[in-house]
Design a protein with these regions (language model features):
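PLD/PLD-like phosphodiesterase catalytic module centered on the HKD motif
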Residues: 1-172
Length: 172
């Protein structure tokens, strides 16, 4: 489906510095491991490059800080809509934030899921973030792979459609 890429010094970052997210039109493949960025910050920066965006988020779980970040981006006009797919078990563990989550996200689907992927489909371009980080706050090193390759975003969209068929939908 897509060819492996070579990591160059420009793509590799250390945890000593906060990674810089480049415009995916100029750097179509970006990879870094860091404890200096959160997933919500990456989404925020990508919307600068994509324009107002629709989000499709897959995560094992989400936390209040991440949900509030998405809410803030919606209020700023950076996000048109956001859909969330996350795991049944995680939903039970994060029950106290479920009301906030279902208010912020256009649709929330529960299913068996451990993937952590975000599609940022903007007016100017579409980007996909593959990450080890859930939509939670953490201080651990996490891996992030950002690409604007359309076949990857399309694959994620198709997979989400299949997952929706096996889920419980909490908002329409």
């Amino acid at each position: 489906m897509f060819a492996p890429f070579l990591l160059t010094n420009k793509l590799m970052h250390t945890t000593e510095n906060k990674p810089t997210i480049h415009d995916p039109r100029e750097e179509p493949t970006q990879f870094f491991i860091t404890d200096r960025l959160q997933l919500g910050e990456i989404i925020e920066q990508l919307t600068v490059f994509t324009g107002k965006a629709d989000l499709k988020i897959m995560s094992f779980s989400v936390g209040e800080e991440f949900v509030r970040k998405i809410h803030t981006l919606k209020k700023k006009g950076r996000i048109k809509s956001a859909e969330l797919v996350f795991d049944f078990k995680a939903a039970e563990k994060t029950a106290r934030t479920n009301t906030l989550t279902t208010t912020v996200f256009y649709r929330v689907y529960y299913c068996t899921n451990h993937a952590k992927v975000v599609v940022v489909a903007g007016e100017q371009q579409t980007c996909t973030v593959l990450t080890s980080q859930n939509g939670t706050r953490g201080t651990r090193n996490e891996a992030y792979f950002i690409t604007n390759k359309g076949d990857i975003a399309e694959y994620v969209r198709r997979k989400l459609e299949k997952l929706r068929a096996s889920r419980v939908n909490t908002g329409d």
